[in-house]
Amino acid sequence: MLKRLGRESLEEYSRDAGIISIRPAAVLLAEQEEDVVAALQEARESGLPMTPRGSGTSIPSQSVGRGLILLQSGGGIEVSGSTVKCRPAVIKADLNASLKLSGRWMPVDPSSYRACSVGGMVSNNSSGARTYKYGSTIDYVESLRVVLPEEGVKLLRPMRLEDALSEGGSTGKVARLLFENMDVVERERPSVTKNSSGYRIERVIHDGIFDLPKLFVGSEGTLGVVTEAEFRTVPVPGERKMVVLESSLQELDRIVSALRKVGPAAVELVDKSVFESTGRSRRISRFVRRGDQYLVFCEFDGTGQEVANALEAVQRSEIAQLDPVVLEEERDVAEAWDVRNETLVVAGEMKRGGRVPVPGVEDLVAPREKLGELIENVTDCFERRGLEFISYGHAGDSNLHMRPLLDPSSSADMRILRELMEECIERVLKMGGSMSGEHGDGMLRARFLKMQYRETYWIMKEIKQVYDPKWLLNPGVKIQPP
């Protein structure tokens, strides 16, 4: 039965992890799939837009809205061989806990895995530290059950392109639209290994297959409401070990390139000043040997022999000359990950009056070989404005989480943020990158989507129109309303 939460919930769900706050008209809780159908019916009849919401961990404000906020309850998980089906409200950590007995996992690991829902991960095309080796959510979705605004419940699976082109309804329309524009879609594909900006239209048609689930992964609740997801799983690696070393900006590309050659699962980056400026230097003291600006965390996983071979390769490479800290005990590796994942929490303690680290350009991603250039470009944008900032991210994929310190309540500071976003996004696009590697567009970046997809934005807007002609789902998120 569809439930309406009390008025006290309106304030709670007016915010997520972003900086935009919007008080909704109502908060609905769907316990079953038919409740989602009923919620969409209420949206149609009332004329109020609807925002599907998971755990509210989204950063560019995908899960707030002025109309109906739709929550889903239920934690059903069904493991079957190499796949697992679950409801969207399942927390990522609980999903992997359920898979543990089978010796498998779904390896996409956002730092918010203890809180984020798998439905949110699908809607956002979430990634994480180990995306370097394992890929993003889009690489693991096998099928989706969705409720569409005009067509009701649908099971989305990959199908033959030939069959999709002859279909009626939304499937045929979208298949023909993408097939007729494959050249321009491919031409505007960012030269990056991870991307959560725009609809992933370049992943839908491949090898004679029309892979419709991939269109909905990363669509941020703008095309339909996911009610069940089926994921591919992989065996849990037998061992994990880590190398931690320091790097200057000048050395960074060379060091990360050398680590990539050894075959890591993750290559992570933290600016030590985040800890030093908040009086938390002790947390990183065991890794400090040379005094350089950055810490690089590199994890290797696999069989015992594979990991041993990787560590031997590190010792034979130029990395050995940089006095790395080698962590071979499981508890030491876990502690190092805790330090890496504490970065944003520690950064939250950085306050200069009303100024705090804010998102906006916190998810830029460049071609892998341009990590140093990306840092230099964004740093220049900050320093010319005299702004303090924090810096960390996924070095292996050249995906940086850099946040300037600004006051979200100051209209002057928010003007600075808009200027920063336009300049930084323009620079990263010239590098062949994307304005979002894993956090998505949301309301915060929607206005800039035309900058990234100058030739294909109209295709994305047409897809939105096909599935949601009344613009009931998350208007203003990703694709701006007409």
PLM regions and their residue ranges:
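C-terminal substrate-binding/cap subdomain adjacent to the FAD-binding core in PCMH-type
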Residues: S123, T131-Y134, V141-R340, K450, ...
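Conserved phosphate/anionic-ligand binding catalytic regions in large, soluble enzymes, centered on
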Residues: S58-I59, M121-R130, I209-F231, G393-N399, ...
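Short, hydrophobic beta-strand segments
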Residues: I22, A26, M242-L245, D292-G302, ...
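N-terminal flexible segment immediately upstream of the FAD-binding catalytic core
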Residues: M1-E45, S55-T83, S111, Y134, ...
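N-terminal glycine-rich flavin-associated loop
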Residues: S14-M50, L70-S112, V122, S126-K173, ...
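Helical (often loop-to-helix) elements that flank the catalytic cores of nucleotide-handling enzymes
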Residues: S409-L429, L449, Y453-K461
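General beta-strand structural signal in soluble alpha/beta enzymes
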Residues: L2-G6, L28-A30, P49-G54, S61, ...
